[in-house]
Amino acid sequence: MSGAPPSYSFVALPPRAKDGLVVFGKNSARPRDEVQEVVYFPAVDHEAESKVECTYISIDQVPRTHAIVISRPAWLWGAEMGANEHGVCIANEAINAREPAAETEALLGMDLVRLGLERGTTAKEALDIIVSLLDEHGQGGNYYEDAHSCHSFQSAYLLVDRDEAWVLETVGKYWAAERITEGVRCICNHLSLTTKMDEEHPELRTYAQSQGWWTGEDEFNFAQVFSPADDHLDCCAGKDSLEKQEESITVQTMINILRDKASGVCIDSESFLTTASIVSVLPQNRSSPCIHYFTGTPDPSRSIFKPFIFVDDVKLVPKAQSPCFGDDDPAKKEPRFQEKPDRRHELYKAHEWARAVIESDQEQGRTLRKTMLELEKQGLEAMEEILSSPEPPDPAEVGDLFYDCVDTEMKFFK
C-alpha cells in the first residue's frame, strides 16, 4: 500500500450545478478494514493558552472553534472530509510527489482538514489557516493504522463554500492554490495545478530552482515540477465522470458519480475500499440551509446517504461513532499501533450484515437494496422541500435529522 489510494473529491458550481446550488462530494478510499465514523462537535470557547491534541502532536488552540460534522477514520483526530456551521466543506487527498513526504510525526493532512473547518468561516479563510499551520508545524506521520510500516503522503485539499471553491496542493511546507468560481472540478491523488495559480508559497519557485526541478526560464507548471517522474498527470477518472454530465448537476447526480465502480471512482480493490462518502449542497441563497449527506459506512453503492443540517441543538448519534479507548488507545501510545482494537460502531456492524446479504445477490439482497434506495429517496425529497421552501426549517425538527435516519436505517437491517 505504498501508493496513494485512488480517492476523488468533486465540486460543481453554477451554471453547471442546478438552481444556484454548489454541490460538493467525496469518496474516501482507505484500507479495506478501516472504520470511519461520523461525529458532530459543537462550537466551543476555549481557555487562553490552551492546547489541542491532534493525531500525533499538540498545537496552540484558538479562542473559539466552530461547530463541525466530520467523517473520519476512527483511530485519528482529524477528518477525511466534513463541513462546518458556516457552510464550509473540506476534503483531503493523499498525494505522491517528487519530494517524499516526511515520516516524522507532525500534522496529518486530515488534521488540517479538521483545523480548517474548526477555524475558518469561508473556504479562503480555511485555506489561509491551513497553509499557516503547515508553515508552523509541517506535515508528516503515518496515514494508516499500521505498526509494520509508515505510509506518509503529501496532501491536496478541495475547500468549498456557498460562493467559490479553492484547490490547495501541498508538498512539504510549499503549496499552490487555484480559485474556482464556476463549472466543475475534480481532484484525486495526483497534483493537478499547472500554470494557473492564484496564490502560492512565497518561496515555491525559488525552492524548485534550488532542487534543480525548474530552470526559471520555462513557464512554471506546478504539477510538472513537483510530480514524480513516473506520475501520469492526467488520469483522474473522476474528472471524466463529472465533465460528461450533460444536465445540471444535482445531489442525485453527485451520489450516482460516487457510486460508479466501472469508472473507478468507487474503489473496491484487494487493498482499498471506499470506506465512507459525503455529498453536500450549499445554496448560494443564504436564507436556505446547507445540507450534508453522509454514509458513515463503506461502499456508497451499498450505503444510504443520510442528511445532516446544522442547528443550535444537534442530537448526537452514538450509533455512528466508534468506541472510545481514551489514553489506552494503541494509536496514542508509543510505539504506536501495537494492537488493533475493534473500532466498529453499531451502524457499521449492522451494515456488514446488509452488505453480505446484498453481495449474495439473492432475492433478499435485491429487496434490501431496493428498500435502502427508497429510504434514501424519501430523505432526498424531504430535503428538496426544505431547500425550495421560503421559510427556514424548524430547528426542533432537523436537530435530530441524522439521528433519525441512522435509527431508521438500522431497523431495516434487523
UniProtKB/Swiss-Prot annotation:
Where does this polypeptide localize? Cytoplasm
Major place of residence: cytoplasm
Q: Name one Pfam family in it.
A: Peptidase_C69
Q: GO biological process: what's one of them? A: proteolysis
This protein's record includes keyword Cytoplasm: yes
Q: Which GO terms describe its cellular component?
A: cytoplasm; nuclear membrane; nucleus; presynapse
Q: Which domain of life is it from?
A: Eukaryota
Q: Which PANTHER family match?
A: SECERNIN, SECERNIN-1
The protein in question is named Secernin-1
Read off the lineage from the record: Eukaryota, Metazoa, Chordata, Craniata, Vertebrata
